[in-house]
Amino acid sequence: MSRVCDITGQGKSFGNKVSHSNRKTKRTYLVNLHNVTLLSDILNRKFKFKVSSRTLRTIDYKGGFDLYLLNTSSRKLTDKAQKIKKLVKNAVAKGVKVSL
């Protein structure tokens, strides 16, 4: 299992551990991932994801999973999230109401 966010693709990053004497040693920073089920109100479906805490906070801030997908550019999303975004866009085009 890779430690990558299923929505944004955010993975581990690299940096330095700096000691008191200012010596630097390489280290990795892992992403804080959670297994969550997100509900799409427009599609009336549930989706299971492995999502980072940062992405969860952003989804709450944007007003829900559907609004997050609609208001986020496709190049910031993974392929899996882009497919769901396309489904949501098609449902909105057919006349399903988007509630805030």
Swiss-Prot record:
<keyword id="KW-0687">Ribonucleoprotein</keyword>
<feature type="region of interest" description="Disordered">
    <location>
        <begin position="1"/>
        <end position="21"/>
    </location>
</feature>
<dbReference type="InterPro" id="IPR026569">
    <property type="entry name" value="Ribosomal_bL28"/>
</dbReference>
<protein>
    <recommendedName>
        <fullName>Large ribosomal subunit protein bL28</fullName>
    </recommendedName>
</protein>
<dbReference type="GO" id="GO:0006412">
    <property type="term" value="P:translation"/>
</dbReference>
<dbReference type="InterPro" id="IPR037147">
    <property type="entry name" value="Ribosomal_bL28_sf"/>
</dbReference>
<dbReference type="InterPro" id="IPR001383">
    <property type="entry name" value="Ribosomal_bL28_bact-type"/>
</dbReference>
<dbReference type="Pfam" id="PF00830">
    <property type="entry name" value="Ribosomal_L28"/>
</dbReference>
<comment type="similarity">
    <text>Belongs to the bacterial ribosomal protein bL28 family.</text>
</comment>
<keyword id="KW-0689">Ribosomal protein</keyword>
<dbReference type="InterPro" id="IPR034704">
    <property type="entry name" value="Ribosomal_bL28/bL31-like_sf"/>
</dbReference>
<feature type="compositionally biased region" description="Polar residues">
    <location>
        <begin position="10"/>
        <end position="19"/>
    </location>
</feature>
<dbReference type="GO" id="GO:0003735">
    <property type="term" value="F:structural constituent of ribosome"/>
</dbReference>
<dbReference type="GO" id="GO:0022625">
    <property type="term" value="C:cytosolic large ribosomal subunit"/>
</dbReference>
